[in-house]
Regions:
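Hydrophobic, proline/glycine-rich low-complexity stretches
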Residues: 1-64, 195, 199-202, 210-212, ...
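Low-complexity, intrinsically disordered regions enriched in charged/polar residues
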Residues: 6, 10, 25, 92-93, ...
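Aromatic-enriched hydrophobic runs in primary sequence
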Residues: 10-11, 31, 54, 58, ...
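Short linear motifs at secondary-structure transitions and domain/linker junctions
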Residues: 15-17, 25-31, 51-59, 71-74, ...
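Interaction-surface and assembly-scaffold signal
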Residues: 117-255
Length: 255
């Protein structure tokens, strides 16, 4: 009855205290089944598709325009595939398709699942920050990541990364401007646009990592392609908009 509420009916803003994103390269044939028919994989050299894990510490997350005191602080984890979508106007949008979402608080799970299609679940988050190393882990979700705190950008790309340099790697750093959700029953695509300024993520050296969810997808060859972090950035998401998808490529704007 109130399913329309899941379509991001209002803009939302937050302050990102930190956003750490690890991007993994996978052969495109192995990722295709993870995305809906309306989207295309955003590939590199027509060979690699990408799955990113984003870990974001938000502050004062709230409907846009509301006072900060009404906001809440949450830790958010998102597993996303890099994709493209062609709009009814013929624009080719780069964005993300979310395949799993987690948070550290039940309140975010509750309201997130009312106002989005992201199917949040609550998990434990353990953060251990020392002078040179930051570790983030979860017992329930079975993940652990340890990085060196960036002192400069003169660090090497991860071994076996498909990118030649960090400049090339930044194209797949995330988050991208758009996030997409698809309803196969009525062939409608929900488009969420994120807006930020001064987005200049810094490369980080990953000491160790393990993500049970990535293991559970059963991909045969997953390679860490890059890792970036950014601090203290205001961010907001516009109200969602919907387009009717036509397999022949003639999309129509719904509202």
């Amino acid at each position: 009855m109130f399913s329309f509420l899941k379509n991001h009916p209002f803009a939302v803003e937050a302050f990102f205290e930190s956003s750490l994103v690890l991007t993994f390269a996978v052969a495109k044939e192995e990722v295709q089944h993870l995305i809906p028919e309306c989207l295309e994989l955003d590939t590199f050299r027509d060979k690699w598709a990408f799955i990113a894990v984003a870990m974001v510490q938000t502050k004062s997350l709230r409907p846009k325009g509301f006072p900060k005191i009404m906001g809440n602080d949450f830790f958010l984890i998102g597993y996303r595939v890099f994709v493209r979508f062609t709009t009814s106007a013929g624009k080719n949008l780069r964005g993300l398709y979310i395949i799993k979402s987690e948070t550290d608080k039940k309140k975010m799970e509750f309201f997130g699942n009312i106002f989005t299609h992201y199917n949040y679940s609550t998990t434990d988050i353990i953060q251990n920050k020392q002078k040179e190393v930051t570790e983030i882990s979860s017992i329930k979700s079975g993940f652990q990541i340890k990085i060196e705190n960036p002192a400069d950008e003169n660090i090497p790309l991860p071994p076996s990364s498909p990118f030649a340099d960090w400049k090339e790697a930044r194209r797949y750093a995330g988050p991208l401007p758009f996030t997409f959700t698809y309803n196969p029953a009525d062939k409608k695509v929900l488009i969420i646009e994120g807006v930020r300024e001064n987005w200049k993520p810094s490369p980080v050296k990953v000491i160790d990592y393990q993500f049970s969810f990535i293991d559970q997808i059963h991909l045969s060859d997953v390679t860490l392609a890059n890792a970036f972090i950014i601090h203290n950035i205001p961010y907001y998401w516009k109200k969602g908009r919907i387009e009717k998808w036509n397999k022949a490529g003639k999309n129509s704007r719904a509202f």
